[in-house]
Amino acid sequence: MNEPTINTGPEDASTIESLIAIAVGNTRTQIGSFLRAESTSHASVDSDDTESIVRMVRDRMVGFQGVSDPVIAIAGVHPSVIDEVQSSFNPGAVIRLGVDLPIDIQHTLTESGERTVGQDRLLCAIGAFHLFKQACVVVDAGTAITADFIDGEGVFHGGAIMPGVGMMLESMHEKTVALPSLKYERIDPESNDPGKQTESAMLLGVTASACGAVRWLTERYAEFFDGYPKVVATGGDLGIFEDDELVESFVPDLQLVGLRVACERAMQLDDGNEE
């Protein structure tokens, strides 16, 4: 396993000198580089394309030559892809969160929920609280859409999981005779017209489903929290919410930020430096 270089910065906050973070999703994998906690690159590739994932990681390793020996950390919801990426490097070269290092976050999940919660949800929660230091609803729009609640102390309370817009469109096509196969396109934000043809009606419907669900859930969480949380969007389909005034912040690499913070937090725990 790589031995990380830890820098101590302002307010005694420790950061890894350099990190290559890999977040493996159901459909897409994000790869990011961090130098002293600052993001220096962010890209994504199909999760099935493990050769490209490995190549992109190796390219980033070369980019750090002469700077420091980077920590390489991987997490996600696609175990077979994670296994293949890990096996492409020397044993111990790639740290696997949840196995080699814990994902440390306070939560109120049940025992079953703790066992089955997706790493992507936990990492996005860690990333959101790290960035905003307040109660948040984190909306991750990908193959599925999740809307999770983190309170003002950074405690993860769980949330909701629903089909992503692509899954909705695919399901309508596959489960009916007449509805066509469509790729998601953003609807015109300046128009309040009903859908005038089947395709536009389907796009309007899935947009309303996603945006309406997030609004309903946010109101539910606000009542639970007795205060209105900040709404943060991430994920490959975050563009769904670009015209929704409810969503205050868009952070495409939120999961990578959370992965970095979780990695640093776990290493500090290993070193006995955590307060």
Predicted regions and their residues:
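Glycine-rich phosphate-binding loop plus the immediately following alpha-helix
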Residues: C124-I126, H130-K133, G158-L203, A262, ...
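Short glycine-rich phosphate-binding loop at a beta-alpha junction
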Residues: G66-H78, I95-L97, F225-G236
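Glycine-rich phosphate-binding loop and adjoining helix at the ATP-binding site
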Residues: V71, V77-F132, D244-R265
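Long hydrophobic alpha-helical segments typical of transmembrane helices together
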Residues: F224-E275
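N-terminal phosphate-binding loop and adjacent alpha-helix
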Residues: E38-E84, G166, L204
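Phosphate-binding/catalytic loop of phosphoryl-transfer enzymes
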Residues: A93-K175, T207-L217, E274
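Gly/Thr-rich phosphate-binding beta-strand-loop-beta motif of the actin/hexokinase/Hsp70
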Residues: N2-S39, A128, Q134-F156, M172, ...
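Adenine-nucleotide phosphate-binding core of ATP-dependent small-molecule kinases
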Residues: A43-V45, P189-G227, D237-I240, V247-E248
